[in-house]
């Protein structure tokens, strides 16, 4: 568990650290003070692209991750959207992709619990969410390590399945 004020200050520190700006997969980083979250636009990994072609027979355009705070669980909450590349009558476009087996596609079966949600404070848009119910057990919430809670959370909930490589 991380108190909201601590989350807010650690989110700013995380953004300022440039960890996402320097990530090879990251195309764009946007800190949203109004909605109290961090939006990332990512290039799909080769493995994710291969899984998508094999499972869904589709080509990926990009991935969106949104880091926000769950006031119900008092934990960070990771939201995810996957966009596919399409061509209709020769006109390229991107379309939101809603795979039926998201865990297999992301190769996170048994590691995280994902669900499809409508997020009201994000214009009622549809996102997959990594359920935060076991977060404190996974990340560890001892008081002496609270100052690094969000960094540890990011390494587990994002970098563990997407990998991290400097650009």
Swiss-Prot record:
State the membrane topology. Peripheral membrane protein
Q: What is this protein called?
A: Ubiquitin-like-conjugating enzyme ATG10
Q: Which family does it belong to?
A: Belongs to the ATG10 family.
**Single GO MF annotation:** Atg12 transferase activity
Subcellular location(s) per record: Preautophagosomal structure membrane
Q: GO cellular component annotations, sorted alphabetically? A: phagophore assembly site membrane
EC number(s) of the enzyme?
2.3.2.-
Q: State whether it acts alone or in a complex, and with which partners, per the record.
A: Forms homooligomers. Interacts with ATG7 and ATG12.
Its ancestry begins with:
Eukaryota, Fungi, Dikarya, Ascomycota, Saccharomycotina
What are the alphabetically sorted keywords of the record? Autophagy, Membrane, Protein transport, Transferase, Transport, Ubl conjugation pathway
The record places the active site at 133
Any GO BP: autophagy
Note one Pfam family from the annotation.
Autophagy_act_C
Alphabetical list of InterPro entries matching this protein: Atg10, Atg3/Atg10
**What's its job?**
E2-like enzyme required for the cytoplasm to vacuole transport (Cvt), autophagy and nucleophagy. Acts as an E2-like enzyme that catalyzes the conjugation of ATG12 to ATG5. ATG12 conjugation to ATG5 is required for proper localization of ATG8 to the preautophagosomal structure (PAS). Likely serves as an ATG5-recognition molecule.
